[in-house]
From Swiss-Prot:
Binds a second Mg(2+) ion via substrate during catalysis. This is Enolase. The gene is eno. Coiled coil: none annotated. Pathway: Carbohydrate degradation; glycolysis; pyruvate from D-glyceraldehyde 3-phosphate: step 4/5.
Amino acid sequence: MLDKIEVPIEAIAAREILDSRGRPTIEAEVLLESGALGLAQVPSGASTGSFEAHELRDDDPQRYGGKGVLKAVRNVHEKIVPVLEGMNAFDQASIDLAMIDRDGTANKRELGANAILAVSLATAKAAAADLGLPLYRYLGGPMANVLPVPMMNVINGGSHADNNVDFQEFMIFPIGADSFKEGLRWGAEVFAALGKALHERKLLTGVGDEGGYAPNLASNQEALDILIESIERAGYKPGSQVALAMDVAASEFYRDGQYIYDGSAHSPAEMVDFLASLVERYPIISIEDGLHEEDWDNWKLLTDKLGARIQLVGDDLMVTNPIRLQKAIDLGIANSILIKLNQIGSLTETLQTIALATRHGYRSVISHRSGETEDTTIADLAVATNAGQIKTGSLSRSERVAKYNRLLRIEEELGDRAVYAPKVGLGPKFLA
């Protein structure tokens, strides 16, 4: 049906705005000849995989410490606009391919993945607006009705916080709830209980980049112990109602073939054994980036040891890239992929990567970045693809909560058609 609709792009504009860390990012607007308008903002990561698409910055020390994005804005106006003006907004694949071809590099270094993605998403939003459809319905069609289970990052460490916790994210997973709305409430109640538990221990209750608490703790295990206590204090059962997940972000503390955590160096085999011991001790059902992004051999060891029991998610390992995902599939590594739009740099490529994962039985976890905006595209993307899981931070900071609130509205809009992912087997991939 959509291939028979033609509405040309009339104008495209871009500007430099600020993200949640006070750093510049790019916003794009796409106006169609029908008058429909789409607006999109691009996030930015703190711990980034080496193989991500290129985020173009100005490198001008006189502005924003070199982090400005005026080059990307200029590329939209001078290089992307001449290519896309007049193209059919409903031909998303051709629009994205035209920008990729104009860029001409393997990682979008010429135009910048941030410039390309901003226009890509704004085009999709304009097309949805032209039809009077919400973005999730435009992208996903009539079967887009699964609300994701949220992976709530309530204790921040690593590159997301100025503390001594090695692992980057400790998350709660309300898998036992009956609806997204109920799961969100459970998460908020556990988050409140966690704040009280930290306060009673005279630990800091300031928050990190993603809205989770960022206390100094004696060990990574202490973070898990406090989470178990907080789940119980909120009135829920650890595991069956609220499970745990971790983003280890192991590439961030990998040095010369060793993993440096809890104050000492450990071999890859010791790292695998340590993660396995945590799974034995705690109700952990998902581990992301448990090893370095290029430690393929030991990723295989980790997968053989835990892959039939819990969800093993590749983020830095796969960077939303179909080539790296295919390598993981071929090697039997991990069983899930984290999906970040700006890692690959266009909507079309993101959807292709999700489709590849689905064909091979890998789950997709739709994710934010540590530097976010009020843009809620990922909430719609999670529902559009029936991904079943979303990572968008804690229960504080409005750029995080905006995505949760968008999902609440989608669930309400869907009414009786709305399905909470764990109820139909579309939550985390685990067999324990």
